[in-house]
């Protein structure tokens, strides 16, 4: 079966920590698979993910529009449209928007645990615009 996901028909999640919004296209709830998690993210200027890592999961960002920095063990590097960022499992990382940012992300497999290294548990909390709460694991 082929799935077609339309962005305007999918639930939007807003981070409890201001400045981040995401829409999932592929996840357990939408496609009944846990092999990967995929969606788009919007960051306002200066919004950032916490410094974190994912156990048992590879993480990819493809920058569509805007500019950001990626922090990892290699230092802090600028990224922009057309750049693909690959974060191996268990590598600490942070993405910070230096201007409004739009990117596609996917994580595989979708059976992972996120560990916050700098930040709070609130960094993992997202509210659906319909009022339900989604907590990243």
Task: For each feature predicted by the language model, list its residue ranges.
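Conserved short histidine dyad/triad with adjacent acidic residue
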Residues: 39-54
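Ligand-binding loop in jelly-roll beta-barrel domains
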Residues: 32, 89-115
């Amino acid at each position: 079966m082929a799935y077609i996901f339309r962005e305007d028909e999918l639930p939007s999640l807003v981070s409890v920590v201001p400045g981040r919004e995401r829409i999932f296209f592929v996840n357990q709830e939408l496609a009944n698979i846990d092999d990967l998690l995929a969606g788009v993210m919007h960051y306002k200027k200066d919004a950032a993910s916490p410094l974190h890592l994912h156990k048992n999961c590879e993480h990819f960002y493809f920058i569509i529009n805007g500019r950001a920095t990626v922090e990892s063990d290699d230092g802090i590097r600028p990224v922009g449209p057309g750049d693909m960022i690959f974060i191996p499992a268990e590598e600490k990382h942070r993405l910070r928007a230096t201007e409004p940012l739009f990117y596609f992300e996917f994580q595989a497999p979708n059976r992972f645990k996120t560990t916050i290294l700098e930040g709070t548990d609130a960094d993992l909390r997202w509210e659906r615009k319909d009022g339900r709460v989604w907590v990243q694991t």
